């Protein structure tokens, strides 16, 4: 397995009301604005090692515009670009951007835009931002949920297996697990990673006709108690829980989901395990094994099938592909005990 990418560094979101979203991420999430330009606001968590991990720009509808990844080295960046171009996809180079150096941007076969770079500005808090612990980029946030860092992003694609295969074969993502329907062999969810985490890229099945959609992105907190506290803080400030708190079977991470003011879905998670097996082969999970709900005693809300930007069909569907499974594919985890 070729090792080209190191980690997810930031996501760029479009929001109809930029300032409402910025206030939410500052006050309820506990992020800090680092920069403002004419067309974007940049924010970071206290434990993010780089200048920012969230960029918010104006858009008519909520959307994931870009997901950015740091390469393993300067040579790996060149190799990644070469391998993308070899598949017939034409990307573009940019000499520098705010907070990082030369980057390669491309739109993948399912419509999702990625930016790859190597050179990056490390964040070192000064004054009241400085931590008393030398390894921390800044002191722990006193505000809101206060996640340590950005964790992962989950997109929606019309063919989960094909998406995973392309990113694995082209860019070296490790495929960690699949959720497959018990009959028909249709994959409704797959997780991939660039490192030892259970995943930093997830894929749900998309039955809409709109390419490049995303389901959510996630923040990391240190402990389960922090996650439960996050639910308390959010609900006390008028942000309801969409799903959770609970635990996913795949990855064994504690989770909760909610929406930001643009309606884009956000997850907070913690726990789970690291996988260091270099020749790992992904297992096929079935829903009854608790792939989505570790406890096998709940059901996923139908709203969780919505991806962004909105389209003519929910994200966990491929209606009509196999007669008799339409409802399963619209929400694979709707049955009690599977969600």
Language-model-derived ranges and their functions:
Residues 3, 9-50, 155-198:
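Core segments of cupin and vicinal oxygen chelate
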Residues 21, 25-26, 84, 111, ...:
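Conserved active-site tyrosine of GNAT-family acetyltransferases
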Residues 96-98, 107, 117-211, 248-249:
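Amide-forming acyltransferase catalytic core, primarily the GNAT-like/NAT-type
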Residues 1, 7-16, 59-146, 190-191, 238-339, ...:
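Vicinal oxygen chelate
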Residues 2, 6-27, 33-36, 40-41, ...:
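Catalytic cores of nucleotide-enabled group-transfer and carboxylate-activating enzymes in metabolic
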Residues 32, 52-54, 90-93, 177, ...:
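A short linear hydrophobic-aromatic micro-motif
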Residues 48-54, 111-115, 198-201, 263-264:
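Short, charged/polar, Gly/Pro-enriched secondary-structure boundary elements
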């Amino acid at each position: 397995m070729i090792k080209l990418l190191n980690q997810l560094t930031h996501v760029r979101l479009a929001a109809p009301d930029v300032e409402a979203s910025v206030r939410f991420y500052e006050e309820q999430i506990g992020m800090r604005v680092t920069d403002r330009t004419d067309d974007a606001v940049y924010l970071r968590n206290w434990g993010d090692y780089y200048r920012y991990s969230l960029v918010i720009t104006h858009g008519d509808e909520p959307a994931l515009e870009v997901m950015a990844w740091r390469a393993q080295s300067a040579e790996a960046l060149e190799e990644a670009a070469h391998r993308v171009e070899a598949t017939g996809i034409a990307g573009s180079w940019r000499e520098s951007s705010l907070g990082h150096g030369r980057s390669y941007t491309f739109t993948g076969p399912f419509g999702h835009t990625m930016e790859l770079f190597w050179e990056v500005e490390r964040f070192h808090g000064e004054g009241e931002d400085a931590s008393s612990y030398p390894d921390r980029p800044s002191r722990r946030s006193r505000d809101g949920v206060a996640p340590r860092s950005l964790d992962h992003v989950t997109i929606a694609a019309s063919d989960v297996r094909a998406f995973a295969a392309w990113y694995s074969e082209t860019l070296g993502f490790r495929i960690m697990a699949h959720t497959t329907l018990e009959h028909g062999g249709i994959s409704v969810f797959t997780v991939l990673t660039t490192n030892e985490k259970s995943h930093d890229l997830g894929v749900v099945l998309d039955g809409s006709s709109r390419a490049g959609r995303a389901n959510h992105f996630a923040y990391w907190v240190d402990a389960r108690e922090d996650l439960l506290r996050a639910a308390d803080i959010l609900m006390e400030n008028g942000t309801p829980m969409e799903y959770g708190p609970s635990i996913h079977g795949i990855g064994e991470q504690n989770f909760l989901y909610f929406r930001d003011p643009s309606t884009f879905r956000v997850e907070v998670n913690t726990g789970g395990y690291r996988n260091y097996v270099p020749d790992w082969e992904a297992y096929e999970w079935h829903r009854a094994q608790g792939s989505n709900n570790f406890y096998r005693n709940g059901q996923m809300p139908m709203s969780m099938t919505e991806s962004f930007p909105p389209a003519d069909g929910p994200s966990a569907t491929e209606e009509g592909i196999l007669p008799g499974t339409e409802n399963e594919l619209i929400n694979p985890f709707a049955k009690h005990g599977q969600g």
